Amino acid sequence: MSDSAVATSASPVIAQAASGEKKVSTKKAAATPKSKKSTAAPPSHPPTQQMVDASIKNLKERGGSSLLAIKKYIGATYKCDAQKLAPFIKKYLKNAVANGKLIQTKGKGASGSFKLSRSAKKDPKPKASAVEKKTKKVNASAARATKKKSSTSTTKKAAGAADKKLSKSAPTKKSVEKKRADKAKAKDAKKTGTIKAKPTTAKAKSSATKPKTPKPKTKSAKPKKVVSATTPKKTAVKKPKAKTASATKK
C-alpha cells in the first residue's frame, strides 16, 4: 500500500515537469521568428521627411508644390510606391506646417500647395557621430601632447643656447673691460705728458719770438703813366705856293 501511494504522489510531479519543458520549448519557438524580422532588409529609400523636402526644393515652383507633384517626384526619383507612402507624406506635411518648416500657400491640411521656409532652405549640417567625436578628441589630445613635448624640448634647447651664450660672453666682457682699463691708463699717461711738456714749448716759443723785430716792408712806388686827357692832333699846314708867272708879269 505504501509503495502505491508513493507512486501516485510522484506521478503529478513528473507531469508538471514535462508541462514546464513544453512551455519553455514553445517560448523559444516563438522567439525565433522575431529574430527573422530583425534581419529583414532595410528600406531602399530615405525617410519621408527627407524625400518630401528634396521634392519641394528641386521642383522649384513659385506657387508651391502640390501633394500630387510631390508623390510623382518621389515615385520617379526614389523608385518606390508613392501611394503606400501617401499617409506618411500627409502626416509630415501637416506637422511641418505646424512647426514652421513648410509654408502652405494654398488649400487646407495636406491637400494644398507647400513651400520650404527660409530656415529649411539652408542645408542642415550633418551631426557628427559619437565615434567621430571620440576620434577627434583623441587626435586633439595627441596633438596637444606632441605640442607640449615640442615646447619643452624647444625651451630646453633655448636654455642651453642661452647658457652657452652667457659663458661665451663672460670672457669677452672681461677682455673688453681690460681693454677699456688699458685705454684709460694710456689716456691718463698722455694727459700728464702733455701738461709737463707745454711750458717748455711755450718758453721756447717766447724766446724765439722776442729778438725778432718785424721790418717794415716798403714797396717802391712805381711812377704812374700820365695820360693826357686831350692830346692835340697835328694839323697839316698848307705851304704857300710860289708865285711864279703872275708876279713877274706885274
Swiss-Prot record:
GO terms for biological process: chromosome condensation; negative regulation of DNA recombination; nucleosome assembly. Residues 1-11 have a biased composition (Polar residues). Residues 120-133, 174-191 have a biased composition (Basic and acidic residues). This is Histone H1.2. It comes from the Eukaryota. Disulfide bonds: none annotated. InterPro entries: H1/H5 (IPR005819), Histone_H1/H5_H15 (IPR005818), WH-like_DNA-bd_sf (IPR036388), WH_DNA-bd_sf (IPR036390). GO terms for cellular component: nucleosome; nucleus. Residues 27-42, 151-161, 192-211 have a biased composition (Low complexity). It is found in: Nucleus; Chromosome. GO terms for molecular function: double-stranded DNA binding; nucleosomal DNA binding; structural constituent of chromatin. Its main location: nucleus. Residues 44-118 form the H15 domain. Residues 212-225, 235-250 have a biased composition (Basic residues). Pfam families: Linker_histone. Belongs to the histone H1/H5 family. Keywords: Chromosome, DNA-binding, Nucleus. Histones H1 are necessary for the condensation of nucleosome chains into higher-order structures. CDD domains: H15. Residues 1-53, 101-250 are annotated as: Disordered.
